[in-house]
Amino acid sequence: MGTMTPAQRRALYESARFARETTYNGPLGPEYTPAGTRLQLWAPTAEQAAVNLYRKGHDSLCIGTLPLQRGPQGVWSIWLPGDQHGHYYTFTVTVDGVARETGDPYARAGGLNGLRSMIVDLARTAPAGWVRDVRPVIPPARRSVWEVSVRDFSQDAASGVRPAWRGKFLAFTQTGTTLHGDGIHPTCLNYLKRLGVGYVQLMPIFDFGSVDEAKPLLRQYNWGYDPTNYNFPEGSYSTDPARGEVRVRECKEMIAALHAAGIGVIMDVVYNHMYRYENVLNNTVPDYFFRQNEDGSLSNGSGCGNEFASERPMARKYMIDSLLYWAQEY
């Protein structure tokens, strides 16, 4: 295609021909089986695409790079034979001669700070009784909503939550906690049950960018409205953010505990912008997923520096796929 300016890309992406030739309705991301994993990446403007394999989600060298094969609608894919559970990967996508290493926009788990994607057997992340978990039916008289940040829910030592679980998903699973351990004033899950709330609305729990998961002792705080990976949980809310499967399992444990207490779960989502413009989506298909002005500059209706181009077919598909994934898997 040759080097294109943002304005030229905008014209391309909004053309009927581009939509007709590149809109893809099939599955994307990793498809795990014990026999092997297929990776599929939508990158229609790429000249080349490759997968980089790692043993760990951080601080390890690449153990191999393999080319992806281009297919219809600009979907690149590769089959990795053997049980790939627990292996980490990134993609290198070359557009206009510029190679960018990036995570998988459809990854189901990731390493420290979400910089590397992880292949995960989701069946291994299911807590005990997960297959029987169902959201409770909340009668009309109890349909009140209590909004909370996962961190704020239990971070204070006065919460009575065990230290390793404070500010984490697992704090929602601990029962019998009282203020300063006084045995009188309930906290956390016991407090919610006494309030009689019907639903807990969790402020963003998918992977966000402003908290460094590698520095848990550093005083850091954000509500989470700065997403970096839409399809797996935030690592700072897990007890071991370096192991990608832990955040998935512990998020499910939190949801199961709330359901067991008769409380429904509402997930606050942020699809209108991302933390940085250089992100897994923009590194894969530059300028496609974010709205531009006529001169190619970024539109900023979100007030956060970029705004999601939900009118474009594959951006809309991405949002819907992500929402369905959370609703069905969690």
Segments the model singles out, each with a brief description of its role:
Residues 151-330:
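Substrate-binding/active-site clefts of carbohydrate-active enzymes
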Residues 42-49, 83:
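Short proline/glycine-enriched turn/loop motifs at strand-loop junctions of beta-rich domains
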Residues 51-55:
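Conserved aromatic beta-strand anchor motif in extracellular beta-sandwich/beta-rich domains
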Residues 64, 74-77, 185:
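Short S/T/G- and acidic-enriched coil/turn segments that sit immediately N-terminal to beta-strands
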Residues 1-34, 70-177:
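The feature marks proteins involved in alpha-glucan
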Residues 58-66, 100:
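Surface-exposed loop/edge segments in extracytoplasmic proteins
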Residues 35-40:
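Structural beta-strand segments of beta-rich domains
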